[in-house]
Amino acid sequence: MTAFSKRTSKQTKQTLQPLFLNASAVLGLVAVPCAMGGRHPIGYLFLTAAALVAVLGWIARVASMPRQQYRIGIAEALFACGLLIGCVQLVPLSPTLLSLISPRLSAWFPFLNEMPTSAAGLGGWNRVSVVPGETLRGLGIFLSQGILVTIFAQRAGHTNEIHRLLNVIVFATGILATIGIAQYLAGNGKYLWFYDFLYNDASGVVKGTFTNRNHFASFLALGWGAVGWFTFCTSSNGRPVHQTGRVAKHFSTTQNVYAAGSLRTVSGFLLLAMVTFAGALSLSRGGILAIATAALVSLISFKCIGVIGWRSTLAIGCTAALVVSALFIHGLDQVSGRLDDFFDETHFANGFGRLDVWKAACSAVTDFPILGTGIGSHAEVSPIYMPATNGIVFTHAENSYLNLAVETGLVGLFLGGIGIVAAIVATVILLRKGTHEEKLIATAFGAALAAGGVHAATDFIWYVPACSTLLFLAGATMISLASRRCALLPACTFELDRISASIAGMFLLVVLGATGFQQFRSAFAQPHWETAVRDNASLAAIAFAPPEKSSTADDNSDADDSTASITNILPAESIDPEVGKAIDTLSRMISSLEQVLLFRPDHPHAWSTLAIARLERFGLRRRASGFRATLCDLEQAALASEFSSRESFELWLRETLGDDVDELVRARHDALESVDNNPLSGEAWCVLARLSFLFSPDPERARHLIDQACVVRPHNGQVLFEAGNAALINGDTERAWSLWRQSFAASRSQRQMVLRALLHAVPASEVCRLLSPDLDGLRAIDVMWSFRSTPEEMRDVRQQRLLAVQKQLELFESMDRVKAPPLRLEAASLQKRLGDIDAAAATLEMALNMDPGLFDPHRMLIDVAMDRHDWTTARREVEWCLMRRPESSSLKILLTKAVLAASHNENSLENTSPQR
């Protein structure tokens, strides 16, 4: 090979790395955010692909040099320590070592650890992580981020590389803001106009392609400093155009230089306005605060550096005016309303969930202070410490620092703190000692660090790959760049030859390939999981249908009573015409779950959901075949028979159930797999308890399994309901009522299950005495029992409900005047149904005095006035309502009735008046 060809080959290889780095930056900072902020398996796959492309670029560079120097600094060491923590959490440990690291685990799994042969057929738990599948997935994400960030940090000594990275960040921030605004103004409720996300939609607020508005606003805040750099530093080397002459070489005239710089500046200011506007319309309080922090830090720093003059100050004022004007046109009231919550005591005193989540997180850290409970485990751990949450799952601790401490312990929090402090120190060093270009870069990334640090105090943005990747890139770049300027941030330098570096690169490719393959499988599993969840929702629509109205029911229980907004729920087994449809839906759901587990066998919830679905299908199939005996009846018969051998029991079971026994065996297998992958699955422990008689005649086994379920899910309504059923079977009525009372209070959906069990056996007044319901519970009892009870039988319940409403009114009138009118309407409706017409009229008049423009009180006052034969008031109110709804035929009928009644009343008075 000639010298020229060798030189050409070397130059080609050297030019490949920038191309690979640019491609990896686009994948990591544009594609990942577009995949639901990276919280979708496809987003994980994009992140791994970004790391893989970066490694390919590194290998291309290695191939062009016989030897190359590498710097290992604080950032690289912290990434290595983080990976080590994740590995330790996954490795099986001896009982002695595990008890030292996580002593609380023995209290969580008393029957799993102390009864390895009798509880569930499993041995004791031997890992720090309580959800190994989630920890492994989180470790794969962190590995991809670490490799990607490390490769970029190695190139931090070249400012051109950093400028390219900043330009990609600017592009990503701008494109996400544009998508968010366009989707908000002209969207169809789907993400990117085609993806129907399972848990929420894209309407209501600006959230772009993120699943949560807080995450979207956080990403914009992290990119605000880069957009500021793009705006105020209008040349390729980071200097304003008027401060450099080198750029003029690329243009024919000086005027072209200034024209290009002016175009970039104008574009930058428009981009700043759009990003700020999108962040404000996200209505994320923490996100708006983070954007304000980034803007403040950026502008002050740019001013101190000297790139903001009087023209730029004027342009900043115009940009702010543009944003405010846009908000005046659309969204200012919503934004100001959200920001008012920062200073509203009632927001914190009246159901502000973050306080409870933070307390629960602190309790978890106290119990697991060393290495935590495992990466990605917060969603499974928090229900142990949280009070009843009405079915809401808190996937994170609403605070990045607390969440990190819960999942990785104080060790992980300490490492994270070192990284934050090191990044801040590095930024300060560059702002004081760096070159002009380095100061501008430090401002852009320093604003991201400040915004991320502020927002992290009110939300866990670090588990969103799009946000955490950008934050890691900012911190690692600052540390790497500052380590070349100051010995305070040491870095170890070593050399690798071409062969060793290539081997290391190939090893990373293999690891990333394996990680990407698992994420690829997860991406295939996700649609099946979403289908299963939607089928489950359709089953709920079948199961939660209202009961048929009894002939003795209260005809005034009012289908149009807007205050009785509780959902009428009954299990599917009570609706015979729908049993076949429910069985078909369950079969489709089971098929989807089997596909999920085929691609992702470590899914934390699919196994338990599959086990429950099999049990439900078993019961419905038996019911459809005409068998009325329940699984509980079958268990009692099996235990009472006292079979002499296992073979005789299996023969009896096969004769009794036929092929349906296979469904129960598969359900037990699925439940065992569930507790093996996620021992905090209370529902799986309940399934094992229900089916324990299949493998042991000892009733104590079922009791132990139910107790285990209550330990790991002490406030789960379904678990408490099953525990109450088990207590009733065992003859402990007092404990059964206590557990049902807790289940009733746990969630709205569980209330219906408890009430359905009591509907045909216990009067409504006795249910109120036994369950001690709150206002929502009284509403549910009123609605359900009204279908089968007389008004007199419901009188006591409605009086209790009225007292509860009045007590709520006393609270809301002083704290939340917005919620007071609906409560007054509910009180008036109850007073009317109780026969106290005068009190109902007075309540409605009071509601109208507070807000005369409300339609519903006027509409109800018509009925009340007619009941009182106050035809003048009735006519006045009907005419008022008709002015607002002139097309209403029912109001026209009422007007005719009121006029005729008033006329008849006047004629009667004339006929009865004395003659003169």
PLM segments and residue spans:
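Transmembrane helices and adjacent periplasmic/lumenal helix-loop junctions
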Residues: 40-41, 281-289, 460, 713-717, ...
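Alpha-helical transmembrane segments of multi-pass inner-membrane proteins
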Residues: 2-36, 45-60, 83-93, 115-119, ...
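Terminal, low-structured helical/coil segments at or just beyond the last alpha-helical repeat
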Residues: 767-784, 808-811, 818, 875-916
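Hydrophobic alpha-helical transmembrane segments in integral membrane proteins
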Residues: 329-341, 496-546
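Extracytosolic (periplasmic/ER-lumenal) interhelical loops and adjacent juxtamembrane/interface segments
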Residues: 96-128, 196-197, 364, 376, ...
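TM-adjacent membrane-interface loops and short helices in multi-pass inner/ER membrane proteins
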Residues: 89, 212, 355-394, 401-404, ...
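Short extracytoplasmic/periplasmic juxtamembrane "stem" segments immediately C-terminal to an N-terminal membrane anchor
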Residues: 107-114, 199-203, 342-355, 528-546, ...
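Soluble catalytic regions of membrane-associated enzymes that act on cell-envelope
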Residues: 385, 390-392, 520-802, 813-833, ...
